[in-house]
Amino acid sequence: MKIYLVGGAVRDSLLNLPVKDKDWVVVGGTEKILLERNFQQVGKDFPVFLHPETHEEYALARKERKSGKGYTGFDTDCNSDVTLEEDLIRRDLTINAIAQDEYGNYIDPFQGKKDIECGLIRHVSESFIEDPLRVLRVARFAATLVHLGFKIAEETMLLMCIIVKKQELSYLTSNRIWNETEKALKTLNPHVYFQVLYECNALHFFFPEMYFLYEKKNFLNRSFFKKFCNKNIILMGLAEISLLNKDIDVRFSYLCQFLSVNQIDRNYSKIFFDSYAASIIHSLCKRFKIPSYIRDIAVLNTGFYFFLNTIHYQSSKNIINLFSKVDAWRKPDRVKKLAFLSNFNFLRNFKSEFFCIKSGCFLEKCFSVVKNVSIKLILKKGFKGYEIKQEITRLRIKKLEFWRIKNIKHRFYL
């Protein structure tokens, strides 16, 4: 029985990247042998075991044969006579099909090291097309490695297009799609992920809302599209915001704020909270079961997008209503998230010399002015029930209005 380090740990080591998880393949072993050595079996579809001390994953070498549709339609052979090369050939990319033995020697039957040197993301074999999940994985690896000069091999992109054409993507679960998307959003260049999906014709299947951004003819409001929603501007913005902020909810929210404009042709200046735009994002998040902490910021930022961009002109009453709508009194961190996004949009979309304070900074300043209005004084005055809410809202509006009037001479806003 021989044990080899495989997959991402070998790849990242060769790339001088931090190694996060170590996966091992066991050649010539059996379930019985590993269980006798106190390994814990955890795999459902095929035998995977946790090391009794390190808790790293050890999988029996296996062969796979396509027997059905989608990424789960495989028959697996984990017999002890399966060779290392037979195990490696079933992997998606050459850079992920390198093994390392206990002495540090590399076993690289598919020239993965050469592809790493050349910066090439290339499939291992023609069986690549049997697993539709690989479309998302390749797009994600492109986003992960583009800063190191990697690109997708032309023949691999061709196979990705074939997978899409065969309609294999329909067998992917929403959970699988989001898992890969979430990983991509955490990379240095998440915009590359969506661009690759567009180039292999998969974007319209996974994210039809985003696909519309590539189809200008679908936009009703042409002038708005040209100014704010050109696909290159949006993807460039996603690239830029990712340099400034690592939070996935912020990155995702930036992207989402544009996804409803293809259906809208209205007077934005009169909108407090755009329920229609927010509902599109809410439906998207529901479709992929996106975590609530990401969904909530995305929905709020989209709904208040135009309000926040014109916050200098908004009434104190509406600003207080915004804080209540986003539940800022209990979740002040939401104000920081929305302020960051608003500042970013402000600096990209408007001439900042018009104002002495950015829209997001103004939002945070307003919140700092009113967040400590005391409810104790209201209770002492005998207010009860709904009257308490009305009175604290009135006091917050009054305090904010006083601050704004007092500071007009300092030109905090027009």
From Swiss-Prot:
Binding site for ATP: 8, 11, 91, 137, 140
InterPro entries: CCA_bact, NT_sf, PolA_pol_head_dom, PolyA_RNA-bd, tRNA_CCA-adding_enzyme
Protein residues bound to Mg(2+): 21, 23
Residue intervals passing through the bilayer: none
Family: Belongs to the tRNA nucleotidyltransferase/poly(A) polymerase family. Bacterial CCA-adding enzyme type 2 subfamily.
Molecular function GO labels: ATP binding; CCA tRNA nucleotidyltransferase activity; magnesium ion binding; tRNA binding
HAMAP family with a match to the protein in the record: CCA_bact_type2 (MF_01262)
Single Gene Ontology BP annotation: tRNA 3'-terminal CCA addition
Keywords: ATP-binding, Magnesium, Metal-binding, Nucleotide-binding, Nucleotidyltransferase, RNA repair, RNA-binding, Transferase, tRNA processing
Miscellaneous notes: A single active site specifically recognizes both ATP and CTP and is responsible for their addition.
Name of the coding gene: cca
Keyword Transcription attached: no
Name this polypeptide is given: CCA-adding enzyme
Binding site for CTP: 8, 11, 91, 137, 140
Cofactors named for this entry: Mg(2+)
Function, in words: Catalyzes the addition and repair of the essential 3'-terminal CCA sequence in tRNAs without using a nucleic acid template. Adds these three nucleotides in the order of C, C, and A to the tRNA nucleotide-73, using CTP and ATP as substrates and producing inorganic pyrophosphate. tRNA 3'-terminal CCA addition is required both for tRNA processing and repair. Also involved in tRNA surveillance by mediating tandem CCA addition to generate a CCACCA at the 3' terminus of unstable tRNAs. While stable tRNAs receive only 3'-terminal CCA, unstable tRNAs are marked with CCACCA and rapidly degraded.
E.C. number: 2.7.7.72
